[in-house]
């Protein structure tokens, strides 16, 4: 019984003392793996989360337009880079993969432009529908072009 209790205390001590260190090592490794596309996608995701909350509110159109502009700039920057998943593909398929990725980003940017026009026109019903389309394009793109975590 004493040995069992001592083992529990030993394991608990290691977890309490070593756990934070292990977490910081993992976080540092994750930071090293951050790509330019990943940084831009993070910017887009933060803006998109906020935009989904505001899209239907006509009183928030100015803020919504700023969020769309942030997403558009991040999308345009991300489109300039090659997804990390391309490195896992055979050389013969990389160019087509990258071209398809850029085409999908252009499609996303096109929907963002439509969304900006809807906000400028005060058409929040259309804006809410376009936010749904953006979500669909985002999900499809992530399935096809994002490297699994």
Regions found by a protein language model. Name each.
Residues 39, 43-46, 50, 66, ...:
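Charged, amphipathic alpha-helical oligomerization/scaffolding segments
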Residues 62-69, 95, 99, 128-133:
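Short, charged, amphipathic alpha-helical segments
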Residues 26-67, 148-149:
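Immediate post-signal-peptide N-terminus of mature secreted/exported proteins
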Residues 1-10:
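Bacterial Sec-dependent N-terminal signal peptides
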Residues 16-26:
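C-terminal segment of classical bacterial N-terminal signal peptides
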Residues 84-120:
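Long, amphipathic, charge-rich alpha-helical segments that form helical bundles/coiled-coils
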Residues 52-89:
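Alpha-helical segments in soluble extracytoplasmic regions
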Residues 111-149:
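C-terminal amphipathic alpha-helix
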